[in-house]
Amino acid sequence: MTVLGALKNIAVGTVGKTTDALRIGNGLDARELQPVGWFAHEQAVEKLRASYAAIPSGENVRLAKKTSNLFRGRNQSTTPGLDVSGLGAVIAVDPVAGTADVQGMCTYEDLVDTVLPYGYSPTVVPQLKTITLGGAVTGLGVESACFRNGLPHEALIEMDVLTGTGEVVTCSPTQNVDLFRGLPNSYGSLGYAVRLKIELEKVKDYVELRHVRFHDVHALTETMEQIVETGEHDGESVDYLDGAVFSLEECYLMLGRQTDEPGPTSDYTRDRIYYRSIQHPEGVLRDRLSIRDYLWRWDVDWFWASRAFGTQNPTIRRMWPRDLLRSSFYWKIIGWDRKYDLADRIEAANNRPARERVVQDIEVTPEHLPEFLEWFFHSCEIEPVWLCPIRIRGTGADGSELVGEGETLGADKEHPWPLYPLTVGQTWVNVGFWSSVPVDLLGKDAPAGAFNKLVEEKVSALGGHKSLYSEAFYDRETFEQLYGGSFPAQLKEVYDPQGRFPGLYEKNVDWA
């Protein structure tokens, strides 16, 4: 190493030690959190009710919430929002029953840090720390336990929902069943979850990982299906299952097994990058993480999206404050980009076309997964993409019915959640891709959102679905065919007759 190189290394190391000493926000490490109790919750609900009453009649009702994990815009409003400032915690934990009562704006980061000391975890922990439990239930949250635990709303025992009438309505599999079944994937068009009672699952201290290399997506898909059906691979049980596709010739399944066996663990919260640790030329690569680090393995680098901010450059990473290696801070950078068009300005300065944001999660069945991946990798240069198999549970852990029959909804064991009708007994594979393409990828005269529209068409042609947390371009007729038909409108007549909340189509396509 040259003298200049040595001096640079010392300087970078010094800056890194200084920034690591800074305590910024929630940081990366576990915090000691206690349930807030019922009295504090009831006070927060009263504040929520008062803020609702203060919104002029005829005005749309929104949350007064600073953070979001939605990748679509929202029309600006000067009307004050709902005060949810006291609704961001766990209310109570019952370690004997394995349940928790949780406020709707509680982030999964806070939920995990509250219940993990009891030896429990939510049944599904979506990938990013600031996703809220209410957001995952009224939207969509997926992760590597979905192949055995279904989706977050399938862990629901009971909910209190602020409806468009200003009432807080309790719903469950046997009470106000239409609302209980209709709130998932409603994205705030019917109301907001104030309290959610959920089942938890026992977890062990560590996760043993096997990263299995494949050279084609057909072989990967076949193995994924076998694991979903059997819960094991090569004689070892599988508790967690997801995948990453870097190209059609380089793809991986990441298999996790819970264990209490002590031993060394890897750390991907500073210099090392988790998704890069997956890559290897052949066979199986093993790794170990603590259970908490496993649950948040994707948050540190926002899967792989942190590369857009320079944090995967070794020099920048060493100097970057450790506490800011988290998706919530990258979201702030995205906010600055949206406000000042930073990315488009950079492209223009380099004589390159502006970019069309392509941030989507879609689901197709395994039989159509290879076709979708082959089409996608031949159509754009976005890589890698994430895979997460999902299996709707249909019944509770004890075999009981998850949902009952409502006044509008009949008993439907195949499609218990009508606004996102994944079929019980059918494996679905979530495919996530979060990047951009040149706006002229499909031609200089291509309309806005051209590639996203092409994705929608391909997914529909394969009988799939698309999550609505990002931009959607469907016409109303197509949208209603895909997302609940007339049922959302029927529910609004009961729970939001004055239309205080924007409708599902208006919220997700028109950005109301």
What are these regions (language model features)?
Residues M254-T265, S327-S328, I334-D337, N350, ...:
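Short glycine/threonine-rich loop-to-helix capping motif typified by GTGT followed
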Residues I362-P370, E374-S379, E383, V429-N430, ...:
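Extended C-terminal subregions enriched in glycine
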Residues P35-T130, A136-A145, L387, V459:
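Glycine-rich N-terminal segment of FAD-binding domains in flavoprotein oxidoreductases
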Residues L70-A89, A145-G166, Y192-E199:
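Structural signature of FAD isoalloxazine-binding scaffolds in flavoprotein oxidoreductases
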Residues M1-L33:
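Intrinsically disordered, low-structural-confidence terminal and linker regions
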Residues V15-K17, A21, G25-N26, K339-A348, ...:
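Activity-critical C-terminal alpha-helical subdomain
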Residues T138, I157-E371, H378-E381:
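C-terminal substrate-binding/cap subdomain adjacent to the FAD-binding core in PCMH-type
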Residues R62-L63, D239-F246, R357, I362, ...:
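A short glycine-rich, hydrophobically flanked beta-strand micro-motif that places a catalytic Asp/Glu
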